[in-house]
Amino acid sequence: MRDTIILAGGYDLDRMGASAVRALGLAALFERCGYKTLILGKFGAVPAPDAQLERTITGITCRDIRQPVAGGPFPSYTSSAAPLAAAAELIGIDRVKAISAYNYPALGAWAMIRYCRQVGICPILDCTEWQIWEGRKVLRNLWRLAGIEARMRLLTRMAGNVICASTWFEKRLEGVNTVVLPFALDTSREEWRRSPCDTGQERVRRFVYSGSPGLGLVKDRMQPIIEAFAILRKEGRAFECTIIGISRDEYLQIVPRHAPLVDQLSHSLTFLGRVTHCRSLEIVRNCDFVIFFRKPDRVANTGFATKFVEAATLGVPIITNSTSDIGRYLEDGVNGFLADGPNTHQVTAAIRRGLELAPDDFVRMVSAARKRNLFDICMWTKPAASFLGRLRV
């Protein structure tokens, strides 16, 4: 009986990055659909072949994709199916229903699909990224982008089964077995506990950006956020803004012209750099608004922002612009504010609305945000079960 699904990728399981949050949520969702699961990701260090190779994280069985079983050494999963084959043999090939590969490099995805077809396992590609040019390394970018184009345009059709993070990407996969799963979380877990309800008392509004802005800030538009708060400070408005995921020095290395603005905001703006996932959630849990802004390009439209999912699950209002499927979940003026776009003027206007919101209206907004549990597993069980029932070998 084929009763097990393997989820494979470069999931940062120790740091609990966005990919790990996604993997653990999908594994819990698949288990809710009646399957057993195994996650092949990355621990902080590659386990020794004779060490304890298996860990349980949030109730899900996990192994390191670089050393999935004793023996080896194994070739890299980025170009070989050997680590997947070893894990499948450990479980029993005739028990593995599917292998889901998360944002795999093209060579690794091709090897995975070929292996699955040879042994009667259903190949799935979990695609949440369609990157564009990043940084200044020409050869690296050309090689990387060629692989990404091959994965998104050709290998998705070769696999025949694709998990999409957005309807924007799903619409580009005609004839393929697809499901849109932005995120699925077990919101009964302690990390998704919400803070006590706001009493509506007049106080300084607290804004948080928490995420990985990308190489050269290519993913998230940090510059308009800093410029917007500088404008609002000149207007005499009081606020607190915390930036998680990039330090002050790292930011100014990328945008040195903002040094005067950052200095002007020193009493209202705090850069925390990288923190643990648990610490990040604690800060988000106790803020008034989560903010982030992205260009409406294929990078933003293919994926779905983890920071949106986390804030929405914690019942925190969100200020952002419409990319991907965000417009389906964020109702302007109800559970947050939608900026008209990601430029400085548009970002300033949206944040200003958050600052001008009366205390009673803010309480109502928080209440509206908390009425929705948009990314709980129970919301996604039916479409996931339907997708798994249609899997193609």
PLM regions and their residue ranges:
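Donor nucleotide-sugar binding/catalytic pocket of nucleotide-sugar-dependent glycosyltransferases
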Residues: 41, 132, 149-194, 198-202, ...
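Conserved catalytic-core segment of nucleotide-activated headgroup transferases in glycan assembly
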Residues: 22-28, 187-188, 192, 199-258, ...
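N-terminal subdomain of nucleotide-sugar transferases
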Residues: 1-52, 161, 227-234
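A charged, aromatic-enriched C-terminal amphipathic alpha-helix characteristic of glycosyltransferases
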Residues: 342, 359-391
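Membrane-proximal helix-turn-helix segments that form the acceptor-binding/catalytic region
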Residues: 25-28, 88, 107-109, 114-118, ...
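Conserved acidic donor-binding segment of nucleotide-sugar-dependent glycosyltransferases
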Residues: 332-333, 337-344, 353-359
